[in-house]
Amino acid sequence: MRYSHLFGKTSKNAPSDADSPNARLLEQGGFVEHVMAGVYSWLPLGLSVLRKVEQIVREEMDALGGQEIFMPSLQPKEYWMATKRWDSVDVLFKLKSQTDKEYALGCTHEEVVTPLARKFIRSYKELPFAVYQINTKFRDELRAKSGVLRGREFRMKDMYSFHADQADLEAFYAKAIEAYLRVFKRCGLDVKVVQAGGGVFTDKITHEFQALTESGEDVLIVCSKCSFGQNSEIATLKEGDDCPDCGGKLVKAKGIEVGNIFDLGTKYSDAFDFDFMTEDGKQRRILMGCYGIGTSRLVGAVVEAYNDANGIV
């Protein structure tokens, strides 16, 4: 194709409202076009990059044993009421139809995948299993910013795993960490796995995957010698302390969260009465895990990590 026929062109001038390198460079380079705060059109060049990133993610999730599905973004209010998150998730977009029926635009899919899995899974013989999707999510961000890093509409891969016992969940969780690290390595990012809070997802300690960059929004406490790290929001240690794992010195760093994983326990299976039959014929609550990667955010993180005065490198 001739460049003159390419839909979307590079520009000599940076967008005046760009507040981060990825916002400036992706739009100036003809990869995306800003529609409104937190919302972008992906042009042919940008869509090609996004698809490559999502294919890397898809390959690693398939290798982990995930089965790809596609779930709706439009979700019934009653599902969110069942988990008591209708009023507790402050970024949830809420809609009302012409018949006054209320819906949510999904920022996550625990409320959909749990009753879906409950319909098909009955026995320990069908466990463990994992399903994932790559689709569009929505967040009613109070202040969307930083280009494609913090959007109101964005692309995401979310995987959900189902297990008979805690040991099996923890084994899969560990494999998911390794799969995620392979994804980010293939994307060329220096990523640190850090302990973090569970927010509205779980009361347990979770893990974030932080791409280390000075332009990152998150403040981290990390070891200069080993893999130990904590998000400062839940940090039990501070800069200058000794690392509990290796004794090295802890330092502050900035990062962009590009992925997260959660041990959900029985929070959602309790909400939807999701049991399975054990080998000895008893009913037991199923255990769940959740694993997310923001694929459009990942594109932005790569640009933040690989740019200079001349543009994207």
Give the location of each predicted region.
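TRNA-recognition modules of translation machinery and tRNA-sensing kinases, especially anticodon-binding
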Residues: M1-V313
